[in-house]
Every structure is written in structure tokens, then in C-alpha cells.
Regions:
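A short acidic, Gly/Pro-enriched loop at the edge of an enzyme's catalytic core
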Residues: 118-128
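Conserved alpha-helix/loop element of class I SAM-dependent methyltransferases that forms part
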Residues: 40-58
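Short alpha-helix
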Residues: 183-198
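A short glycine-rich, Lys/Arg-flanked "PGG" loop and its adjoining helix->strand segment in the class I
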Residues: 141-156
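Class I SAM-dependent methyltransferase SAM/SAH-binding core
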Residues: 69-117
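Conserved Class I S-adenosyl-L-methionine
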Residues: 203-267
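Conserved class I S-adenosyl-L-methionine
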Residues: 60-68
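Short, glycine-/aromatic-enriched active-site segment of Class I SAM-dependent methyltransferases
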Residues: 162-181
């Protein structure tokens, strides 16, 4: 299944632009992260892994792609003391990030509104990270090539990547597109792409169970807050949210979708 670039971009912006509504807040941010905004499977666990994998400290500079509302940038800057840049394409998301973190520059992190396939940084970084962004990149290989170029020699890439299990169906793929606007490669193809651009030694951990757990939490919270959510978004939108979480829970539980945490270094 393939989709043209304009359709992909429009679909993804539709998803991201509503990521501060009560469904996300009451069923993801609050029950999973105590109100902090992490909108990918990696969450703060990916950031802690990155800190240990890289040995992050004040002497380092870090770059997040798809920085959303900025909470991950704040987490990395405050926990590890390094300088952080977050790049985000969505106008609404970058405005939310700046509203949430008005003192970011004094705390060591900044936000840039840009398309990561067109933007060029003015410096090289010690680490680049993102959660689930390869799945939504219009050209995975080009993005990986750019990231490799943006890293200093020995710099690290740490990501979570959602890939297709061997038994995924076209019906499953159609659901993923309708829900979130992305296509996914098989695991072997995704890892080969990462290696092909120059990242040879990959530290790969299967965290698919996290996808199951997250969607179970979404379902429990959706029913617990049903009255509030129906009042906020309507019964049809509430039901669609619940059905989406059920379907994603199934896809992860049956390993039609697989989630990987990956760390690697540029030579």
C-alpha cells in the first residue's frame, strides 16, 4: 500500500493537531506519564535508555525530531544537563511547545519549526533521537541519511520504530493508514535501511509488549472517563477512539505490529 506525499502529510497533520484534546490527556498523558506529554511508544523510558547508552552530560548536544509539545526536550535537558534542540513541523505543535515551556532557552533547550527532510542544522550533534518517526517519514532512507550526516563522528542515534510483523494483512495496513497515516516496512527491511546508511552495530530490543500495555491503559481510562470524553468530543468520537485502541492492542498482541528500541553509533 502506498500514498502520495501530500496525502500522507495532510493525514499526519490531522492526527498531530488534535493531540492536546481530552482523549489524549485523560487516556494517555495523565495515566501513563503523570500529565507529561509523550506521544510515542518510547516515552521517558527511551530517554533514560539514551542517557545511559550515550553517557549524556552537560558537554553534549542532542536533537529530537518530531518534538511535538516539547516535554521530551525538557526531560532530556533537565535530567542530563545537555543542550537540546527540538524540530517540529506542525505549526500548532510548535506553538503549544513554546507556550508550555516559555523559559526553554534559559533551561538549555529550544524549538525549531521545520520539515526534517528540508531543514539543515548549523551544528553537528552528539545524539539524535525520535520516537516512532520513521513510520511517518515520507522517505525513510533520506531521513536516515540526513541524521547520519548531522551526527558527529561517534555520535549516536536512539529511536523507537514500529514495523510490520510477518503476518500483517492488507486490512491491518489499511486500518493503520486510516487511524494514523503511515505505512510500515517489515522488521528486516527497516533494520537493513538503518545499516545501509552507515549505522552498522545496532542495539535492538523488542518492546512490543509496551504497545499492548499502552493500549490497555487507553481502553481502561477511556471507559473510566467516558462521561467526560463524550461531553467533550461526542459519542461517535469516543467510540472511534475506543475501537482504535482495541485494534492497536490486537495488532501488538498478535505481533502484526512490532515495536523496536534501537541504539546505534555513527562510525
Amino acid at each position: 500500500m502506498g500514498h502520495d506525499a501530500v496525502a500522507v502529510r495532510e493525514k499526519q497533520l490531522q492526527v498531530w493537531d488534535v493531540s492536546d484534546d481530552p482523549r489524549w490527556r485523560l487516556t494517555i498523558y495523565e495515566p501513563l506519564y503523570g500529565g507529561k506529554i509523550f506521544a510515542n511508544i518510547g516515552g521517558p523510558a527511551l530517554l533514560d535508555y539514551m542517557g545511559a547508552y550515550v553517557g549524556l552530560g552537560p558537554e553534549h548536544s542532542a536533537l529530537e525530531l518530531g518534538s511535538g509539545m516539547g516535554d521530551a526536550c525538557e526531560y532530556v535537558a533537565s535530567h542530563f544537563g545537555c543542550r537540546v534542540t527540538g524540530v517540529e513541523m506542525s505549526t500548532q505543535q510548535i506553538e503549544r511547545a513554546r507556550d508550555r515551556h516559555p523559559d526553554s532557552s534559559s533551561r538549555g533547550f529550544e524549538f525549531v519549526q521545520a520539515d526534517m527532510l528540508q531543514w539543515e542544522p548549523s551544528e553537528r550533534y552528539d545524539v539524535v533521537w525520535f520516537g516512532d518517526m520513521l513510520a511517518v517519514a515520507q522517505d525513510r532512507r533520506v531521513l536516515l541519511e540526513r541524521v547520519h550526516r548531522w551526527l558527529r563522528p561517534g555520535g549516536a542515534l536512539t529511536i523507537t520504530d514500529i514495523v510490520a510483523g510477518p503476518d500483517i494483512s492488507e486490512k491491518d495496513r489499511a486500518f493503520i493508514w486510516d487511524a494514523d497515516g503511515f505505512d510500515i516496512p517489515f522488521q528486516a527491511d527497516s533494520l537493513a535501511q538503518i545499516r545501509d546508511v552507515g549505522f552498522q552495530e545496532l542495539d535492538v530490543t523488542d518492546i512490543t509488549q509496551t504497545g499492548v500495555t499502552i493500549n490497555e491503559t487507553i481502553l481502561e481510562a477511556s471507559y473510566r472517563h467516558k462521561t467526560t470524553l463524550v461531553e467533550a468530543v461526542g459519542a461517535d468520537e469516543w467510540l472511534a477512539w475506543v475501537e482504535g485502541a482495541k485494534e492497536y492492542r490486537r495488532l501488538f498482541a498478535e505481533r502484526k505490529l512490532v515495536c523496536l528500541r534501537i541504539g546505534t553509533h555513527r562510525a
